[in-house]
Amino acid sequence: MTLNIQRQAPEQSEIMVANNTVANTQQKRLSIGIVGGGIGGVAFAVALSRDSHLDVQLFEAAPQFSEIGAGVSFGPNAVKAIQRLGLEASYQRIADSSPAPFEDVWFEWRRGSDDAYLTASLAPGVGQSSVHRADFLDAIVGNLPEGIAHFGKRCVEVKQDADSATAYFDDGTHFTGDVIIGFDGIKSAVRR
């Protein structure tokens, strides 16, 4: 069974050729399948879906978005990546962070015997912050365009040839695209 994904019509552009005539060309959108609807997969899908030259589809094994676990702290580079993905507002709404005047402190070292201050690692502009995994996933899912998330799609195999890659799901459907990207966890079918 084939998963029918509706794709937008290709963009058209005009090109001037040598004899001053105008030729219409169609630009093919790169088709991307993302397997895994956790924080990484959803964040990447949100970021890629902002590019009009990409047709992004997200496949999640669960019947809905859900995340387990507790709090997670993001280091300075992770917070900068969140900013570059355009998810900073979603992150800041739910993140706990250090209050002034310690907002740039990432980590502080103290002596165990008397709690005397030793040193600190600074991360100007990002500091130390943390979120609950489920809250962060809920916040970034709100940025995901309608119609690109598909649930109940547990990937069991990926095959590729010179022109495309195909993800096969345990419900008998499959998705063929230009690229398949795996965010499907430790038992990744994409990685195999």
Which role does the model predict for each range below?
Residues 35, 155, 175-186:
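Short hydrophobic core segments
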Residues 40, 64, 187:
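Conserved Rossmann-like nucleotide-cofactor binding loop
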Residues 43-45, 60, 82, 140, ...:
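Generic structural signal for small/hydrophobic residues in well-ordered secondary structure
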Residues 49-70:
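Glycine-rich FAD pyrophosphate-binding loop
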Residues 68-143:
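Active-site-adjacent segment of FAD-dependent monooxygenases/related oxidoreductases
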Residues 151-165:
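A conserved short coil-to-beta-strand element within the FAD-binding core of flavoproteins
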